[in-house]
Amino acid sequence: MLLFTKLAAPKAPKRRSRAGCTSCKERKKKCNEERPQCSRCAERGSSCVYEPVRPRQRRKRDSFITSLADASTNGSHQHEAEEDDHGARFDRFDACEDHLSQHQRVSHDWGHQPWQASMPDSFDDDLIFSPLDDTFDPNVLLAAAPLETSSVIINPDEDFTGPLSSTTQPRVLRYEEDDDDGEEEIDIGGGGAGLIGIKHDRRSSFTSTTTVATNTTAGNTIFSTDLTICSPATVRSPLLEFTCPSFSEFSENPRQRSLVDHFCNVLSHLIVFREETGNPFQQLVLPLMRGGGGGGNNSPVADAVFALAGAHLEHRGVDVKGGEKSLYFHHRAIQGLAGLIRMHNAGVNRNEVLAAIMLLIYYEVLVQRGRSNIVEGHLKGALTVMCSNPEPLDSTGIFLERAFRFYDVIAALSFGTAPLSTAPAAGCLVPFPISAPTATSTLNNVDSLLGMATTLWPIIHRLSALLPLKTDVANARDAGHNGKVAVLRTEFETTVGAVEAALLGWTPNLPTGWVLHESDPTKLVEDTTAAKDENSTGEEKRSGGDSARLHSILNNALAYRNSALVYLYRTVLSHPRDHPLVQRHANLSLRHCAATVEHQGPMGALLWPLFVAACEAVTGADRDTARTAFAAIDKRQGMTNIERAWDIVQEVWRRAEGGTEETVRGEGVRSDTSPAQLSMACSRELKGTADMWRVVSKEMGVNIVFG
């Protein structure tokens, strides 16, 4: 409890030492004042001379200052009280008075009269603004006072290309001061700063001038305002008083901001391969959260982001209290998406619709609720939007279309149906991002969603259409349409041969200076036989930090290649589990999956090749490899489909060991039968081939999308 008040004694103003040696003063360096020789002079081997310290000189106050102080007694008393509390203001007040008196003697004869209550203020009330007002313009404050030219040195090599705005980069001031009373030099640095230095009186360094650089339509202009002349001070921005919460531009709700934070800092990194130029979900999808929501409602993209992030947290057992569950945001996203589709012809952003659909597909893949065809319905909706409005694609459109193609093929392989889109021509897919590749990066050939499998994806797209084509052959055979059977069978056999040859001949596009190891296909080594110039050598040295990520991305692509061959031989051509081709490529695929996990690289697209190869694993070593890989990706990704896929794999192993697996083979067909003969025999016996894992999945009542 405060019993009495007492004015604190004024603090002694801090003074700079002026007793340094002459050598340090000339160089404008700080002197430690050691005798007989300071450390700087001792280091340079120069003579160290100390001069007597001269007393400080103060300018005499003119009668104007005296009359001004007498006329404003109340203001003086208030200033003296502040001076008692803050002694550091003493010098600033003296400097202000000295500058005013000097300005009166040299420049003007103003003839000021003592202030009286009847006299109007020199500044109109209209010049006092609030930065929260819509009409607030900082340029009015700058133009309110007379301008005074400062001694400014302009670098001719620098230019001022931007207007004075909130995005202007701040200047970093570096003071280099002399120990004597006199001038001090301020170096203004920073990117693109055109000011080299400003020289002014040291005693008025805090109050005399403020220099601002701006660009007008007539040309570049540098001006300074004298704060002792323009008396009211500029109003500080309220944003300087507090820190805005992260992601406050997307939502005012703390719970929703935490979901955006989880999406940006966790989820977006789990589903891409390449982030050296930025995460595409953060750069391209996140800005779409601001659109589409009218009347205070969130946009469908925002609700889909909230649903996806919330479902991922809920699956990991994280209960973020104080907000709605992911299912609530999912329903809102569905309703908002339906409204956007109804208004699609009214100028609604096409990318916003596609982004909402793709995020909802990610949500459905994550939660995996029973045997539903919601993913297929979303994919059909996305295809309808893309076909109904074939606009020129920007970066966001290209990225969303790439994500659609990925899930279209993965869903076709998962459900055994034909893909909705047409297969892209060979060589038409280029790695995303397309623009501005980094010259020294080893990941220039890596796609953000497909990794190194960009050139492999058209082949896998054609592979996914083979099982439905085989089913069509069987249906035509049962219906007795012999002509149709002949046409479809020819198409099937031709496509099978082309896909098999393409898969066996495919090789990843490796970065410069790297080749596959001859004995271990999971490793990359430096190409020592090829001639290297200085630039390629530098690239190899700089790529050492990305070596682990590069190995992981490479093994992911090779796992897709070998699992595609397993799918071709086992599912499409109905080879038995113990067939040499099936076991060879299943073993290679599991080795590549293990190498992907070992290098701790991206694992977002590893589930399908790992699942296909693990279902055909026979030996204990292969099953241990599959078990380790499943545990690693489940720990990293935290998705429901990974857990359910692992449950199905274990059930397939149990049935295979118990001899209860339903093997589909034609009568009199040997294991070395050609693919064409085997496909004909299978088409006569059954309407397609049912994999054991599909039977198990149906019995468990789930549909798994291996994305």
Swiss-Prot record:
Its main location: nucleus. Residues 527-544 have a biased composition (Basic and acidic residues). Pfam families: Fungal_trans_2 (PF11951), Zn_clus (PF00172). Keywords: DNA-binding, Metal-binding, Nucleus, Transcription, Transcription regulation, Zinc. It is found in: Nucleus. It comes from the Eukaryota. Gene3D superfamilies: Zn(2)-C6 fungal-type DNA-binding domain. PANTHER family: TRANSCRIPTIONAL ACTIVATOR PROTEIN UGA3, ZN(II)2CYS6 TRANSCRIPTION FACTOR (EUROFUNG). This is L-arabinose-responsive transcription regulator ARA1. It comes from Pyricularia oryzae (strain 70-15 / ATCC MYA-4617 / FGSC 8958). The gene is ARA1.
